[in-house]
């Protein structure tokens, strides 16, 4: 049995090792997490074969569920991208005269972000911000910051996004409930961290026109886009199916045939599988795409997920090593003796890791590995709430270590100081508001 000082030192050094190898030595996060796994196993006295077996089971156990959902979700996102469905949502919301332009960008980010990776969402939707900025003579910062903040929020707190799904799965949280709570918290955080924060700044927010190098980026011709009804149906279908499963679990007898059917179609794998074929028809065939074209788009989409799958698999390995080495159990006792509220702890760990590593996904996986062991000591706090707390922390502190920071800086034509001052602050405010929303939810449910 290792001393508590040894356990804490091992964990802290492993986190520093992850940060240094990623930030300083430019290791891929997959390699950094595996290196940290071997380090923890060695320091905790695990045998070589035990380490390998734990890493193997960690990767397999994690990707066994998530690989299919991430793959299917990628197809959905790709169909949204190539069909112009995301632009359709933005153009339709633009017609709502009672909504301000910055609030429209938040709603576009939240809805479209459900099926799009955050960086893809920024690249795909920023032309809409350019278009509105030109028409209304508005500072691009006032539109791009709410959009990117909303995309980041939904990326961190709403399954079936990979990191949010990973956290919910590892904590044993109900995915349908996490979706509902995540959308509520994400909307509140995005509105306050985006439009409200920028409104508070008023004239202090500098005017930023569309950069000349992006002046040619335009929204597609509206006549070529799918209908709003078809778009929303496709985007919301997998979420609706997963919510039906949650409702069935709360209200139906387990032995009924209907309950079994709803459990089946509401499973994230089945729900996204059904949604993919709906997307193929609604956003593909009805838009005059051939099956060959859709196959090409699907293959192109799969090429982009190898990175995220490897990172998530390595995160599962790190988690498995913490459990197998008994570090997790000792850590749970140490954390419980700190008398810090688990919601605050989950948020703080994810926030710090995101700032250090620059990846919300890695931050959420690391926070899950640290916080999960102590959950049995707090039976009154649901795993759904902790999942939202971890995601809320990962929203904040988008700084120079995060590629999204540079993407926003580039598209807005902002200086380094301006990006820190306005975008980093916006994400931090959104993160704090999301934390407050999580605490509020914990008192209600």
From Swiss-Prot:
Domain of life assignment: Bacteria
InterPro entries found in the cross-reference section: Glcn_transporter (IPR003474)
Membrane protein topology class: Multi-pass membrane protein
GO cellular component, one term: plasma membrane
Cellular localisation: Cell inner membrane
Coiled-coil annotated residue ranges, if any: none
Gene Ontology BP term (one): D-serine transmembrane transport
Keywords noted in UniProt: Amino-acid transport, Cell inner membrane, Cell membrane, Membrane, Transmembrane, Transmembrane helix, Transport
Iron is among the record's keywords: no
UniProt activity-regulation remark: Uptake of D-serine is inhibited by carbonyl cyanide m-chlorophenylhydrazone (CCCP), and at high concentrations of D-threonine, stimulated by D-cycloserine and not affected by D-alanine or glycine.
Transmembrane segments: 5-25, 29-49, 57-77, 106-126, 140-160, 178-198, 224-244, 265-285, 302-322, 343-363, 385-405, 425-445
Disruption phenotype: Single deletion, grows on D-serine, D-serine plus glycerol and D-alanine. A double dsdX-cycA deletion grows in D-serine plus glycerol, but not D-serine or D-alanine alone, growth on D-serine (but not D-alanine) is restored by dsdX, while growth on both D-alanine and D-serine is restored by cycA. Double dsdX-cycA deletion cannot take up D-serine.
Main location class: membrane
GO MF annotation, one: D-serine transmembrane transporter activity
NCBIfam families recorded: gntP, PRK09921.1
Function: Protein that allows transport of D-serine across the inner membrane, does not transport D-alanine nor probably glycine. Is probably a H(+) symporter, as CCCP inhibits transport. Transports D-serine more efficiently than CycA.
Note: E.coli CFT073, a uropathogenic strain (UPEC), was originally isolated from urine, which has a high concentration of D-serine. D-serine is toxic to bacteria. The abililty to take up D-serine coupled with the activity of D-serine dehydratase (dsdA) may allow use of this amino acid as a carbon source in a sugar-poor environment.
Name the record gives this protein: D-serine transporter DsdX
Originating organism: Escherichia coli O6:H1 (strain CFT073 / ATCC 700928 / UPEC)
Name of the gene: dsdX
């Amino acid at each position: 049995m290792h001393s508590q000082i040894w356990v804490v030192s091992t964990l802290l050094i492993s986190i520093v090792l992850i940060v240094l190898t990623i930030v300083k030595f430019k290791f891929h996060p997959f390699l950094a997490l595996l290196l940290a796994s071997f380090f923890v196993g060695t320091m905790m006295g695990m045998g070589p074969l035990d380490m390998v077996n734990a890493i193997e089971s960690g990767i397999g156990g994690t990707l066994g569920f998530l690989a299919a959902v991430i793959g299917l979700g990628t197809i959905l996102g790709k169909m949204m991208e190539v069909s112009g469905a995301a632009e359709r949502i933005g153009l339709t919301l633009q017609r709502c005269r009672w909504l301000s332009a910055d609030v429209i960008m938040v709603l576009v980010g939240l809805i479209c972000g459900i099926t799009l990776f955050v960086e893809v969402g920024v690249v795909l939707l920023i032309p809409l911000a350019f278009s509105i900025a030109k028409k209304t003579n508005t500072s691009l910062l006032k539109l791009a910051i709410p959009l990117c903040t909303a995309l980041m929020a939904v990326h961190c707190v709403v399954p079936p996004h990979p990191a949010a799904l990973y956290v919910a799965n590892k904590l044993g949280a109900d995915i349908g409930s996490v979706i509902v709570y995540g959308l509520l918290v994400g909307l509140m955080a995005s509105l306050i961290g985006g439009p409200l924060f920028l409104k508070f700044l008023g004239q202090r927010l500098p005017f930023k026109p569309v950069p000349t190098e992006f002046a040619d980026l335009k929204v597609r011709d509206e006549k070529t886009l799918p209908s709003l009804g078809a778009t929303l149906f496709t985007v919301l279908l997998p979420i609706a199916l997963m919510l039906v499963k949650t409702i069935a679990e709360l209200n139906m007898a387990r032995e009924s045939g209907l309950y079994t059917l709803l459990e089946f179609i509401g499973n994230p794998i089945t729900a996204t599988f059904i949604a993919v074929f709906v997307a193929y028809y609604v956003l593909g065939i009805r838009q005059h795409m051939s099956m060959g074209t859709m196959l090409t788009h699907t293959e192109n989409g799969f090429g982009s997920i190898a990175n995220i799958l490897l990172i998530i698999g390595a995160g599962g390995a790190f988690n498995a090593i913490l459990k197998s080495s008994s570090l997790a159990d000792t850590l749970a006792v140490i954390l419980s003796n700190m008398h810090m509220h688990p919601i605050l702890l989950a948020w703080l760990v994810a926030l710090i890791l995101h700032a250090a590593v620059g990846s919300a996904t890695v931050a959420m996986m690391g926070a899950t590995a640290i916080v999960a062991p102590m959950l049995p000591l707090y039976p009154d706090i649901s795993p759904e709430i902790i999942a939202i707390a971890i995601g809320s922390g990962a929203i904040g502190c988008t700084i120079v270590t995060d590629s999204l920071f540079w993407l926003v800086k580039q598209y807005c034509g902002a200086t380094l100081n301006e990006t820190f001052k306005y975008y980093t602050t916006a994400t931090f405010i959104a993160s704090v508001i999301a934390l407050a929303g999580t605490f509020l939810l914990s008192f209600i449910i």
